[in-house]
A protein has these predicted regions:
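Short, conserved clusters of charged catalytic residues that mark active-site
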Residues: 70, 93-96, 152
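Short, well-ordered loop/turn elements at secondary-structure boundaries
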Residues: 81-85, 104-108, 166
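Long, contiguous hydrophobic alpha-helical segments, chiefly transmembrane helices and signal peptides
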Residues: 75, 87-88, 112-114, 233
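Short, solvent-exposed loop/turn segments at secondary-structure junctions
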Residues: 42, 93-96, 116-119, 127, ...
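PAPS-dependent sulfotransferases, especially Golgi type II membrane carbohydrate sulfotransferases
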Residues: 51-68, 75, 79-82, 121-171, ...
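Conserved phosphate-donor/acceptor-positioning beta-strand/loop module used by diverse small-molecule
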Residues: 90, 101-126
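PAPS-dependent sulfation machinery
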Residues: 1-87
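Short, hydrophobic/aromatic alpha-helical segments in well-folded domains
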Residues: 74, 97-100
Length: 249
């Protein structure tokens, strides 16, 4: 399986080398766990389909619990020879199903990072565009679709959080991770009362030093290219910016 995955990524890098600037992956690096949901056919990792009709509306109306039960089973299967170890999993797609996570993993801790929507919406649109090579594509029509999709995802997560104990979640600013990654990690460990040894902290620091932002190239994108204005995004995400005091500089 490793050999097959390595060959897959090598071919993908050849076909779309610019994608490394956006979301670098290889057979030897971490990847988002949400790919485990691909087999349920109810997964945001299909790409733009979750933003397009009719699949988009169908997806947003579904009960995600059956898919997450499958997701949990896959994790158990992967861990069956190493019981008791703690998973560290990551995907923004989980914002659609925080209730599923807390139900199926009753001792889970949730870390949510917050980022300037002016950057996030455009960055996401650019990433999705990179997956549409060879297809007819209108950026100016796509931008508003991406904005609405992300706004609805955030709204969905806020509704679910009303039923989740605050001590199970920590909210962090994306800018803090970039400015002081290890210091932000300390805050996470303190919030969830987890032991942070000197060895673990050194390993975090070493990783941060070896993987600075932009290591694989700068991801360039411009708001206007996607048919959006600053005012539109600020208006749509005003509830989010105010709620989490998101830095806009």
């Amino acid at each position: 399986r490793y050999v097959q995955l390595k060959a897959f990524y090598e071919e993908a890098h050849k076909k779309n080398p610019d994608f490394d600037k956006i979301h670098y992956t290889s057979a030897d690096t971490p990847e988002e766990c949400i790919h485990l949901l691909n087999h349920t056919f109810q997964d945001v990792q299909f790409g733009v389909e979750t933003m397009m009709e009719p699949y988009g509306s169908w997806f947003q109306q579904q009960d995600h619990m059956p898919s997450y039960r499958y997701y949990a089973d896959i994790l158990r299967m992967l861990q069956w020879q190493r019981p008791g170890e703690r998973w560290l999993l990551k995907s923004p797609a989980h914002l659609w199903a925080l209730d599923c996570l807390t139900t199926l993993f009753p001792d889970c801790s949730i870390i949510i990072t917050h980022r300037n929507p002016l950057e996030c919406v455009t960055s996401y649109a650019s990433m999705m565009e990179s997956m549409l090579i060879g297809r007819d594509f209108d950026r100016k029509q796509f931008g508003p679709v991406v904005m609405e999709y992300l706004a609805r995802k955030v709204e969905s997560s806020l509704k679910q959080r009303e039923h989740i104990s605050p001590d199970r979640i920590i909210d962090l600013q994306f800018n803090d991770f970039i400015a002081d990654g290890v210091g932000t990690v300390r805050r996470i460990y303190e919030h969830f009362r987890l032991p942070l040894t000197a060895d673990i902290e050194q390993r975090f620091q070493r990783y941060a030093d070896e993987h600075p932002m932009g290591k694989h190239g700068k991801h360039d994108y411009r708001l206007e290219e996607y048919g959006l204005t600053k005012a539109q995004i600020l208006d749509r995400f005003a509830f989010y910016i105010e709620r989490f005091n998101v830095p806009m500089g």
